[in-house]
Structures are given as C-alpha cells and as structure tokens.
Amino acid sequence: MKQLNNPWLGVEGYNCFACAPSNPIGLKMKFFLDGDDVLSIFPLGSNYQGWIDTLHGGIQATLLDEICAWKLIHLLGTSGVTSKMEVRYKRPVLTTWPYIVVRAELIEQRRNILLLRATIISPTGDLCSYAECTYYSFPPEKAREIGFLPCEAIGEELTLEEVIAMSIL
C-alpha cells in the first residue's frame, strides 16, 4: 500500500477538522491506497471519548465521512459533497485501544453520484461501525474553480504494520 499525498498542505486557509495536520484540535487523518480501497489508521485516546473509554459516535461518523471523501477524490480526481450518510454502530470502539482501521470502498457509481461504504475495524479485526454514504461529485472544472487539488499515491510500498507504526506515533 502507498500513502496518498495531501495536496492542500501549505494552502492558505486549509484547516480541515478531519485531515489537516496543523489543526490543533483536529483528527489529523492520513490516507493510504490499499488495492482499490482507501485506508486510514486512526490513533485513539481519551480526547475523543463520549462515554468513559468509548469513542464518541460523532467522531466515528466524521472518520467514516472523511474516508469516503478521500476515496472519491482519489477515484475520480475531483471533489464532491456528502448528500446522504447512514451510520450503523455495531460495537463500542474503546479509546484504550492503540488504533482503529478506517476503510472506504466504492459500491456503485452512476454518472456523478457515488455510493460508498466505509468501515471502522478494531485492532483484532472486529467490525465496530460502518456507513453507507452517497456523494455528489463535482465536474472537474467546478472542482478547480473552488480550489480542488487532486491527490496521488506517493512513496514506497508499505505493509499494514508499517502504516500502523507511522500512524500511531
């Protein structure tokens, strides 16, 4: 698997709660291309809890939405917006775990409408939550007008273990 570059690094005003590494209260997600899927390893901690030692459901929803957005960005080379999102919470995500795996895949595409599925998986491989997201993708010219920059896979091939190690530092 290879890391996806973040093309907005250094762009004035870029402060995405989910993926900007410079946002002091953000999630600082990094993304990787794993076959056809986009993957992120999210390090856990008590700052993200709702109930004691439990990851807040709103944080889970944000992780699921953002991974789908990056799947769209990489797949189509354009931007888009979430038009519908349905989240199912299957089991608690414990903030005492070192990390979770967040993954997105394309289910269906009809012209500029995409159906994506995202999952949150525990370190032991259990499904914790998932979302089905419908996205509206912008025509490339519209995306350029609003400052969209495409992302691409960069660097050397990495194993899952290497991605986990570099993500939970």
Task: Please provide the spans of the model-predicted regions.
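Residue-level preference for beta-strand/loop junctions
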Residues: 23, 36, 81, 96-98, ...
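Short beta-strand micro-motifs enriched in acidic
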Residues: 32-34, 90, 105-109
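HotDog/MaoC-like acyl-thioester-processing domains
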Residues: 1-7, 94-96, 107-169
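Hydrophobic residues in beta-strands and at strand termini
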Residues: 42-44, 89, 137
